UniProtKB/Swiss-Prot annotation:
Principal location: cytoplasm
An example Gene Ontology CC term for this record: proteasome core complex, beta-subunit complex
Catalytic activity as recorded in UniProt: Cleavage of peptide bonds with very broad specificity
Disruption phenotype: Strongly inhibits growth in fellutamide B-producing conditions.
UniProt KW Nucleus keyword: yes
Protein's recorded name: Proteasome subunit beta inpE
Gene from which this protein is expressed: inpE
Length: 215
């Protein structure tokens, strides 16, 4: 009997992303390992990116799932943000950017980006905020969230720890992120190599790169 062959353009490139927000900061983090099944494509494939670096209006995005879709979404958003600044003479705000990403994903709902997406930054009130999206563009504001291969492990960890440590300080949040990824690398082969953290405060965006398990 002949085997039917169907076109399926999507694949998952592994990894995990995580977001934590506090009174005056937001963190998006992702590991840098890219996989295809049991193969490692590369040990440095960023999943978190800065959209703009303007003072007091810094925005970061994380994309995980199909890496090519992630790059396409990020590059398209870069162009939209640049056009907004050209037309209005100012940087786009976090809430407007978050809504625009939702629209971009919804526009592709019949052939969607195979991604779990987060957008984070400092809102107009000076508070840290994280917006989480499904592939069809449904948007939800959260204090913390996780996506990707190890999300089922990391999210319960955050759910149990973050409320107990309120009000959450930046240093405590960074340690929670490191602990979550340290545990994830012990149990998920798709996660590892390096932890990339983008920390957004009123002063702008800072990046940290921490070594993770490499085997």
């Amino acid at each position: 009997m002949a085997k039917e062959t169907r076109f399926y353009p999507y694949t998952s490139n592994g990894g995990a992303t995580l977001g934590v927000s506090g009174p005056d900061f937001a963190i998006l983090a992702g590991d840098t390992r890219s996989t295809a099944g049991y193969n490692i494509n590369t040990r440095y494939e960023p999943k978190v990116f800065t959209i703009q670096d303007a003072r007091d209006r810094s925005i970061v995005i994380s994309v995980i799932g199909f890496a090519a879709d992630g790059r396409a979404l990020k590059e398209r958003l870069d162009a939209i943000v640049a056009m907004y600044k050209y037309q209005h003479g100012k940087n786009i705000g976090l809430r407007a950017c978050a809504q625009r990403v939702s629209t971009m994903l919804y526009e592709k709902r019949f052939f969607p980006y195979q991604l779990q997406t987060m957008v984070a930054g400092i809102d107009a009130d000076g508070q840290g905020a994280i917006y989480y999206y499904d592939p069809a563009g449904c948007i939800e504001k959260r204090s913390h969230c996780a996506a990707g291969e190890a999300s089922s492990l990391m999210l319960p960890f955050l759910d149990s720890q973050a409320p107990r440590l309120q009000p959450l300080s930046l240093q405590t949040a960074q340690q929670l992120v490191r602990d979550a990824y340290t545990g994830a690398t012990e149990r998920h082969i798709e996660v590892g190599d390096h932890l990339q953290m983008l920390v957004v405060t009123r002063e702008g965006v800072s990046e940290q790169l921490v070594d993770l398990k490499k085997d």
